[in-house]
Amino acid sequence: MSKRDYYDVLGVNRDASDDDIKKAYRKLAMKYHPDRNPDSKEAEDKFKEVKEAYEILSDSQKRGAYDQFGHAGVDPQAGMGGGGQGFGGFGDFADIFSDIFGGGRGGSGGGRSNVYRGADLRYNMEITLEEAARGCEKQIRIPSHESCSTCNGTGAKPGTQPKTCATCGGHGQVRMSQGFFSIQQTCPTCHGTGKQITDPCGSCHGAGQKKTTKTLNVKIPAGVDEGDRIRLGGEGEPGQNGGPAGDLYVVTHIKQHAVFQRDGMDLHCEMPISFSTAALGGEVEIPTLDGMAKVKISPETQSGRVYRLRGKGVKAVRGAEYGDLHCHVVVETPVKLTERQKELLREFEAISQGDVATHNPRSKSFMDKLRDFFE
C-alpha cells in the first residue's frame, strides 16, 4: 500500500513554515490520540501516519530529501517510534503536550539523561552573479558555542561531579497527569539532563559551553541560484549530553546584476543597436560572462527581436550543460544629429511619402525603404 504525501497528511502546503507544520501536528495529534479514541484502530493508524509525517517534515534535512526524492529519499522507518517511550512509542506526542502544559522538550526515559541533537543554524550569503555562475569559495564567521575546556563540558567545578537529580532520579523526565492524560515532560529541576550541579564551573557558570566565533570556508558550486542551501554537516550548535551537533545551512542570495537578468540557467540582456544597423544588418559586440562576443544582426531587425547565444548562460549545478544567453534587441533613436544627418533624414522622409513603419518584417515597410535609402 503506497503512502500518502506527508504534506497532505498534515493538511499543509509544500512551502509551509516550521511553525505551520507544528501547529498542524498539534491539532491532528490531539484529534487522533489513542487516549481520546479508545478501541479505534482507524484513529490509531491516523495517529501513526500523522506522527511519521511530522517527524520527516520537522527535520530540515529529512524534509529536503523528501521534497527532492519523495518517500524514497527518506528512511522508510523514519518517524516510527520504538519502545520505551511514553504512550507506547508515541514519544513526540508527549513532547507536544509538554509544550501545551508548560513543560520543556522531552526525551526518552530508561534511566539515563536525555541526549539532544544540536540546533541547525542558517547563514545568509550574498554573492555576485559571476560567483554564482562560476562557483567560488567564501570565508564566513559565525557565532557558535564550544565545550568548556575548564570542566570538559560537564558544567561542574573541576574536581567535582554533577549529582543525580533528586526530582527525576536521573531520568531527565517526570510524569504528570492532566485530566485523562498521563504524560512525560522534561524535569523542571535538571531540565532533562538527569543531573544537578551543586558546585558550578567558574568559567562557564555551569553551562558546560562558552560562546565563541568560528571561521569556516564554504565552497559555492557553480550554478547555484537564489535561495539554494548548502549544508555543512556538524557545523551547527553542539548537542547536549553527548548528542550530535546540528548542521549549518548557507543560503545563497544573488546580487542584482547591471547587465544580465537570470532565469534558471538562462541569462537575458538588452542589446542596443543603431537604426541603420537594424535596417541594413551588421555585427555588434555584447558582453557575456566569459567576455565579449560578436552577434550578427540580420537586416530588417525590429526592436524586441531576441538573438540566442547557446551555451553562454549559467552552468547546471549537477552536470556539464550550460544555459543560453538571450539578447533582446533595442533599436536606438539617434540624438544630437548634425545638419547633414538631419538633411539626409528629411530626404528619406520625403521619399517615404509618409508611410508608417510596420512591425511585420515580411512587408514592404519603413525598414525596407530605410535599407534602400542607405544602400
Swiss-Prot record:
Cofactor note as given: Binds 2 Zn(2+) ions per monomer.
Keywords on record: Chaperone, Cytoplasm, DNA replication, Metal-binding, Repeat, Stress response, Zinc, Zinc-finger
GO process terms (BP): chaperone cofactor-dependent protein refolding; DNA replication; protein refolding; response to heat
Binding site for Zn(2+) 2: 165, 168, 187, 190
Protein's cellular compartments: Cytoplasm
GO terms for MF: ATP binding; heat shock protein binding; unfolded protein binding; zinc ion binding
Cofactor(s) required, per the database record: Zn(2+)
SS bond partners: none
CXXCXGXG motif repeats: from-to residues: 148-155, 165-172, 187-194, 201-208
Function: Participates actively in the response to hyperosmotic and heat shock by preventing the aggregation of stress-denatured proteins and by disaggregating proteins, also in an autonomous, DnaK-independent fashion. Unfolded proteins bind initially to DnaJ; upon interaction with the DnaJ-bound protein, DnaK hydrolyzes its bound ATP, resulting in the formation of a stable complex. GrpE releases ADP from DnaK; ATP binding to DnaK triggers the release of the substrate protein, thus completing the reaction cycle.
Domain notes: The J domain is necessary and sufficient to stimulate DnaK ATPase activity. Zinc center 1 plays an important role in the autonomous, DnaK-independent chaperone activity of DnaJ. Zinc center 2 is essential for interaction with DnaK and for DnaJ activity.
Record note on quaternary structure: Homodimer.
Name of the protein in its database record: Chaperone protein DnaJ
Gene designation per UniProt: dnaJ
